[in-house]
Amino acid sequence: MKRIAICPGSFDPITNGHLDIIERAAPIFDEIIVAVLNNSSKQPLFSVQERMELISEVTEHLPHIKVDAFNGLLVDYASTVGADVIVRGLRAVSDFEYEMQVASINKKMNDQIETLFMMTNNQYSFLSSSIVKEAAKYGASVAGLVPPAVEEALRHKYSEGELR
C-alpha cells in the first residue's frame, strides 16, 4: 500500500524550517503532499498560487512531492487525497501543546489518520513565516532563513509596496 503523507501549512512564505521538515519526511513516505491552506479569514502576503509555485520551485529536487491547496478541515482533505499521515514540525514545547490538541481532534474525527511530529533542526527553532516577513518588510536580509527563490520573491513583493 502506498504511504501518502500531508505536510500542511499556510507557507506564507515557505521557510528553511518548513523545507527541512519536508526534506526529512520525504524518504519516509512514498508521496508527500505539501498542502497550502487557503484561509479566507487571513490576509496573506503571497496568494495561494504564488505560495504553491514557490513550494514547487524549492522542492523540485525531491522526488514524490506534490503541491496542492485545500480549504476546510485537514482530515477531510487527507481522506480525499488518500493520505493516512499528517506531518507536523515542532519548534518548541509551546508548539507541542497546540499541535497535540489538533492531532487529538483530528484523530477523533478520523481514526485512520495519524499525526507524525518532527522536531525542527535547532538552527530553525526560532523561525516562522511571520518573523521572516517582518524582517524582509524592513529590508533586513533573510538569507539563510528562506530558500533563495523565496528571498527574491519577498524582495520583489516589498519593493512593490506590500507592507503587511
Curated annotation (Swiss-Prot):
Record flagged with keyword Signal: no
Pfam family name, one: CTP_transf_like
Major localization class: cytoplasm
Molecular function (Gene Ontology), one example: ATP binding
Catalysed reactions, semicolon-separated: (R)-4'-phosphopantetheine + ATP + H(+) = 3'-dephospho-CoA + diphosphate
EC number of this enzyme: 2.7.7.3
Gene3D superfamilies tied to this protein: HUPs
CC annotations in GO: cytoplasm
Subcellular compartments: Cytoplasm
Residues flagged as site, Transition state stabilizer: 18
InterPro entries recorded: Cyt_trans-like (IPR004821), PPAT (IPR001980), Rossmann-like_a/b/a_fold (IPR014729)
Protein keywords: ATP-binding, Coenzyme A biosynthesis, Cytoplasm, Magnesium, Nucleotide-binding, Nucleotidyltransferase, Transferase
Protein name: Phosphopantetheine adenylyltransferase
Organism annotation: Exiguobacterium sibiricum (strain DSM 17290 / CCUG 55495 / CIP 109462 / JCM 13490 / 255-15)
